[in-house]
Amino acid sequence: MSNRDIVYVSPQAYLSSSQDWCLNSQQKGYIPILQNDLLNFKKILDLKKPKTTSINRDHENVASSNSKNSNTNHLGENNASTNGNNLNLQNLNDNINNNDVEKLSYQNMKLFHPISTIDQLYTVSLVGVPTALSDITLETIFKSISNDNVLSWSAFVSAVLDSKIVYLRFKSTLSKIEFKKTLLSIQSILESKDINLGELHYDSNVKDFLNSIDLKNEPIPNTSQEKLINTLVKIISENVPNSNDTKNKIDSDHPESYEIDLGTLSDIPSDSIEQLCKDIIDFRTKVIKIEREKKIKQSLEESRLSKQKLDKIFNQIKKTRNLTPIDSTKSMEGGVLAATATEEEARDDYEEEEDEDEDEEDDLKILNKSIAQEKEESNQRYLMLLNNLNKSIEPNLKKLSHSVLESTNYLDIITSNRSLFNKELQILSTDVYYDHNTSFRQEEIRKDDIDRELNPHVKLITTESIMSKSVEESKESLDKNEQASKSIITQNENISVTSDIKIKLAFKTKIDKSSEIYSSSETESDEEIKHLQTSIRESKNKTTDIVTSSGKDNSILTFTDDELQKRLTQLRESKIVDELVNEYLGVYEDELVDYIFDNIKENKNKHLLLVDLKETFDDDAIKIVDTIWKHQAMLP
């Protein structure tokens, strides 16, 4: 789950119609929820918005009490505490009757959650507070009994109980002594028999914190606050009615009117019972609201139809009254018949309207059906075109691209596959079913002549030109090998002059034989070329044997591994091997280039590399190996 799926919302900001109720970054007072749950969050708050607006109106009508003695909130002395209580006592009724409260310090339970350890130590709870007390009343009571030292408070309402738990958080600016004095004062007020505000509770950490505070000689606040207690009793009795009255006043749609049998929920954990009860009540209220809306719609529709019927009846009666006197007497005589006729006409009109509505519904169904049919046809056309693309168009394009590639590299393909073509021709010549006297031979000759006339600049490529070119290349390679062997022989003192003469004679005899073979006949050219290549290879093997026996040749690299690696990197950076492979092979091959470098690194031998490359490049392997070995990076 990414951070984009989470947003931070503030229920209070939403209920107060603030624009910053939803943020993408976390801030104090904002709750993280999934972005998909944002709509449900708004729906839930919209259901509660009327209640909050009524409370906000009460808040707006409430004004703060203008007290001149601003220092009466401190309980450092008895006089200060009693003055504060008297001040609260004077303004308590005014605050409730005139809604003279500044602003509710109530917070949602999620926002009220303590952030620091100081908040935990300054937080207590009141268990058993009546649910009938409104937020404004509780706010006024808390300010009066704590001398306006309550920072914020929150409440947890049970779905099955008539009381709620109120959490109070005092201001952290209070000193420890003042905090303990305030709690003692509240405890004394709550212990009164006439006041039903619940019991004061706090956890073990707060208890240890209070025990660590030593009042010493500090005066304990006066617990005889009879006037304040009497006023609180009066307020509670006015706002908390009897149980029988409340049951009669509860609306049937109110969630508190539902009674849930907790015996059926015995298998459910106790932690989730309250939430489940809330969900059940919400579900029931939603169902009732939906049913009520349906009934309202039905009643409105029935009233509309009945109104239409009555209007038609009245119109018919008006028409009958506007007749002539004679007609009117006749109509008076048959008044009953006219009334029945109007009723029948009204009934017929109503049936016609129903038929029209049914016709409209039928037209809508036909329209939707036609739209669905068109959509299905378009999908079928799309699938058919896609199938045609995959099975016909793309294979034809690949075939055409392959034929274009073959036509551009026509000469290379012929020379590389010459032996295969000759073998195919040989097989067809001996085939019984092959038509040697083809009827279209003359037509092919005619088209060939026309093509030659249209393209006179194209040179005719014959077997003789190809053979002569190959003979020249073989002679050049033999001359190079002869020169290399001469240089090696001159440097080597152990090689005799007779071996040099034998090598020269061997090269000359092979050259003479190759020239005689090419001049003999054209039909046996392929076999003679192969024989010539084998003879050339034998002569080259002889030269390699001579070179290896000499021992003074740079064909074997004597570099160390580190130095060889450096030289190979220089050779790779120069891209000379890539260019040679692309030039003689016609296509660039990464694997072949890597194979050449791996061979040089492992064997460090020029002739072994030449033998390996013979299979791929044939005679061009000599040029490739010589070019690599003459590169600056490979020189000693």
UniProtKB/Swiss-Prot annotation:
Pfam families per the UniProt record, alphabetical: SNU71_N (PF24826), SNU71_RBD (PF24825)
Record bears the keyword Nucleotide-binding: no
Subcellular location: Cytoplasm; Nucleus
Molecular function as annotated in GO: RNA binding
Any one Gene Ontology cellular component term annotated for this protein: U2-type prespliceosome
UniProt entry keywords in alphabetical sequence: Coiled coil, Cytoplasm, mRNA processing, mRNA splicing, Nucleus, Ribonucleoprotein, RNA-binding, Spliceosome
Stretches the record annotates as Disordered: 55-89, 339-363
Ranges in coiled-coil conformation: 293-394
GO biological process entries: mRNA splicing, via spliceosome
Primary site of residence: cytoplasm
Comp. bias (Low complexity): 78-89
Amino acid composition bias (Acidic residues), ranges on this chain: 342-363
Skewed-composition ranges (Polar residues): 62-76
Functional description taken from the UniProt entry: Component of the U1 snRNP particle, which recognizes and binds the 5'-splice site of pre-mRNA. Together with other non-snRNP factors, U1 snRNP forms the spliceosomal commitment complex, that targets pre-mRNA to the splicing pathway.
Family (UniProt): Belongs to the SNU71 family.
Oligomer status and interactors: Component of the U1 snRNP particle, a subcomplex of the spliceosome.
The protein's name: U1 small nuclear ribonucleoprotein component SNU71
Organism expressing this protein natively: Vanderwaltozyma polyspora (strain ATCC 22028 / DSM 70294 / BCRC 21397 / CBS 2163 / NBRC 10782 / NRRL Y-8283 / UCD 57-17) (Kluyveromyces polysporus)
Classification of source organism: Eukaryota, Fungi, Dikarya, Ascomycota, Saccharomycotina
Gene: SNU71
